[in-house]
Amino acid sequence: MSGHSKWATIKRKKAATDQKRGNLFTKLVKEITISAKMGGGDPSGNPRLRLAVDTARANSMPMDNIQRAIKKGTGELDGATYDEITYEGYGPAGIALIIETATDNRNRTVADIRHIMSRNNGSLGESGSVSWMFQRKGSLDVPKSAMQEDALMELLLDAGLEDLDGDDEVYYTVVTDIRDLENAKKALDEAGIAYENAKVDLIPENYIELEADDAEKVIRLIDALENNDDVQVVYTNMEISEKAMDSLNG
């Protein structure tokens, strides 16, 4: 253990104890619809859609819902048209935030996000103000109980592995180039190794460590953003010491 928790680890711990499923299905339906619209309705030929469908199934979304979302994307069924808009800004203690949205009303969305940010000691920035701090990568989580770190690294070296993060107590986080994510999944599938949370991710080049008080403010802001139906995902460069994390959990 490094003695610190990055945002991905923090989110995983929160999800394990958070009783609210919230608007998860709404977000998943939007992602499936957009993916099908952009790349067609066949997951085998549309990697983004395949990831979205896999995520939906992992979260127990009924296949009927998935199929309807795909058909709305391909135009076989009527449905709302969503625009993907990314906002950038800063939260408490100067941490960077990237907020990805899918909306059928741009004016409503930007007004809502600006309101949430201002009420929680955050501020929106210009396009490009913080995105330079992040790199878009493929990532997935492999339970540490599945295999040893050296063996996992050897398995994935020829499948595009760029980094293997073992800071979390339970999971290794596998990081790849976006184009190699499917190769990593295939290698794990062929080896019979389970994995979770395969996704395209925004990974900070550097992290800002926060103590409990500031971390609590940032988490409150991110919770408020993610509870908005138009917000798909929030990325941040926050890192919390294990001592501060224990204080928050206590």
UniProtKB/Swiss-Prot annotation:
Any Gene Ontology CC annotation: cytosol
Highest taxon of source: Bacteria
UniProt keywords, alphabetically: Cytoplasm, DNA-binding, Transcription, Transcription regulation
Keyword DNA-binding: yes
Stored Pfam families: TACO1_YebC_N (PF20772), Transcrip_reg (PF01709)
GO molecular function, one term: DNA binding
Predominant location: cytoplasm
GO BP: any one term: regulation of DNA-templated transcription
Cellular compartment(s): Cytoplasm
Signal peptide: none
Family the UniProt entry places it in: Belongs to the TACO1 family.
Protein name: Probable transcriptional regulatory protein Clim_0475
